[in-house]
């Protein structure tokens, strides 16, 4: 990662708090993510990971705090501005969100819809250059030979790779991936994480990914941010972060008050 990439802030969250009625889902979470970083939000189900992602793209309005993406304040911008900003924010879902009856190529092309003037009447047609771009993205994820196959005939790992190709077709500045490997076997999980990592390196894209698998986080992330009960427990470079330190977020709150020295108050 170059110094220039490190200097460019793509995402900044300042004391983000989110309540759903009486339930506190996020408690004053702050973080900064730079261009070309792959940052993993790690924690158990209910720790606030997915809620935080949806605060980043404005799907969940924050209760208090501030979210800035690519220079735009998501929490205070007009709705039309936030909708336009979402064109620059790709989202990779746990359950793929593909149209099963469509081919892989047609699903990837959907990622470029925002760049087209939609016809009032008649069928939607894609320019040759867009179709070539979509095939190139499928080739990048290793599925160009399946371009015309229906996505509902693919394995889970293949479907997630199509979903990543669709996200790349969007030409995003930020990619949010919500538990993208939760339903995959270990081999396919590694393939998907490798794709996300290569996107960061080769395209200078920023990826924020939620996971609950410690080994995947340590193996692929530039930084790991641990969440527990809606609070940030640590924010550390993955290099040098031990598995034992990370496992602190899976312990009960009363136990983790006496966490290892690496997670003492000064390191949180």
From Swiss-Prot:
GO terms for cellular component: plasma membrane. Its EC number is 7.3.2.2. Gene3D superfamilies: P-loop containing nucleotide triphosphate hydrolases. SMART domains: AAA (SM00382). ATP binds at residues 43-50. It is found in: Cell membrane. Keywords: ATP-binding, Cell membrane, Membrane, Nucleotide-binding, Phosphonate transport, Translocase, Transport. Residues 11-254 form the ABC transporter domain. Part of the ABC transporter complex PhnCDE involved in phosphonates import. Responsible for energy coupling to the transport system. The complex is composed of two ATP-binding proteins (PhnC), two transmembrane proteins (PhnE) and a solute-binding protein (PhnD). This is Phosphonates import ATP-binding protein PhnC. It comes from Nocardia farcinica (strain IFM 10152).
């Amino acid at each position: 990662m170059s110094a220039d990439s490190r200097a460019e802030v793509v995402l900044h969250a300042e004391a983000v708090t989110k309540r759903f009625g009486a339930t506190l889902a996020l408690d004053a979470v702050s973080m900064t993510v730079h261009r070309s970083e792959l940052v993993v939000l790690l924690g158990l189900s209910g720790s606030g990971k997915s809620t935080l992602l949806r605060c980043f793209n404005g799907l969940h309005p924050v209760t208090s705090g501030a979210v800035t993406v690519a220079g735009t304040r998501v929490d205070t911008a007009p709705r039309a501005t936030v909708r336009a900003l979402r064109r620059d924010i790709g989202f990779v879902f746990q359950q793929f969100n593909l149209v099963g009856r469509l081919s892989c190529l047609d699903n990837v092309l959907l990622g470029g819809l925002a760049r087209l003037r939609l016809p009032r009447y008649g069928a939607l047609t894609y320019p040759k250059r867009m179709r070539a771009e979509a095939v190139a993205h499928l080739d990048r994820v290793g599925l160009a030979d399946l371009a015309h196959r229906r996505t509902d005939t693919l394995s889970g790992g293949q479907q997630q790779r199509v979903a990543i190709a669709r996200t790349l077709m969007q030409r995003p500045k930020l990619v949010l991936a919500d538990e993208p490997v939760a339903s995959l076997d270990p081999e396919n999980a590694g393939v998907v994480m490798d794709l996300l990592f290569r996107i960061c390196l080769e395209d200078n894209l920023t990826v924020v990914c939620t996971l609950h698998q410690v080994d995947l986080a340590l193996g692929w992330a530039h930084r790991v941010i641990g969440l527990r009960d809606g609070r940030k427990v640590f924010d550390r470079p993955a290099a040098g972060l031990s598995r034992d330190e990370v496992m602190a977020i899976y312990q009960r709150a009363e136990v983790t008050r006496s966490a290892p020295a690496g997670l003492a108050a000064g390191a949180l």
